[in-house]
Amino acid sequence: MGRRFKIESSQDHSQTPPRLGLIFNIQRFSIHDGPGIRTTVFFKGCPLRCRWCSNPESWNDYPEIVTNDVKCTKCGRCQPVCPVDAIVVDQEGRKLNRSLCNLCLKCANVCPTGALAVTGQWMTVGEVMKEVEADGLFYQNSGGGVTLSGGDPLRQWEFALELLKDCKEKGIHTAIETSGYAPWEVLAKVLDYTDLALFDIKHMDAARHQWGTGKGNELILDNARRTAAKVRTWLRMPLIPGYNDSEENLKAVARLGLEIGAEKVSLLPYHIWGKSKYGRLGRQYPMEQTPLPSDDLVKRCEKVIADVGLKATIGR
């Protein structure tokens, strides 16, 4: 099960303290983020804004307020502690004006039910390692280990590097899941302590990639080639109906994988498990009109890639 965190005190997030990482979840017994049984550490902060993202709480590199109106008892404790009058509690319930909120987090600290909570906790490498090492026996028996995900761990690369070093010193298999949108100099340092790269490829066309993620793909494709030349690499592609499921794009992804020596492409079918998170963050979900992929579509896409000569798997 994943673990959600709550900030225990207000913190100034304008400057990240040295060797602290901003983590929004640590998921134990994960089987979808690399080989074996793994612990996945989710880093906050991402350079992309993928329209289908199932972890929108990962985008920003600072702690944020998330709401759960069902849990609100209208007790009113949050209103007086807000220094900018961003909260109003009346008979209809609690209202949070995010345009006024200064992210002091005081409201979440006094909320007794979790109707106001914080996503993102500053942690030391030692604190994360305590979670990671708890399942060492499972890693040994299953060929598993730790996976750094997000967001994108490269947004906090110095902390990620220290964490990976610690894992390697303790004989724990390491993997990173990344968008690849970072300077190669940064990625190369992290890869020195990485056994497996789970490298996301959203679309092979630069313009379509820009539309879907907010960024072009030139840097990403260059880094994919360099990454596969350095460490064992799996490509991962979110399968979004009407966006990147064309035969042309699938063949291009497969050819890229063959060119760079990737072991396989993992197809991750679009889902709406993260849809409710958008409302809890005060955002609109942008994919309301996108259908879920049918089993036939997923199998067809898998076959297109396999016919090019690259192994394809579904969901991991």
Mark where each language-model region is.
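Hydrophobic packing within well-folded, soluble alpha/beta domains
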Residues: 50, 72, 82, 101, ...
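Short gly/ser/thr-rich secondary-structure transition/capping motifs
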Residues: 22-24, 90, 177-181
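Conserved AdoMet/S-adenosylmethionine-binding subsite of the radical SAM
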Residues: 126-279
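Extended, non-globular alpha-helical segments
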Residues: 69-73, 120-135
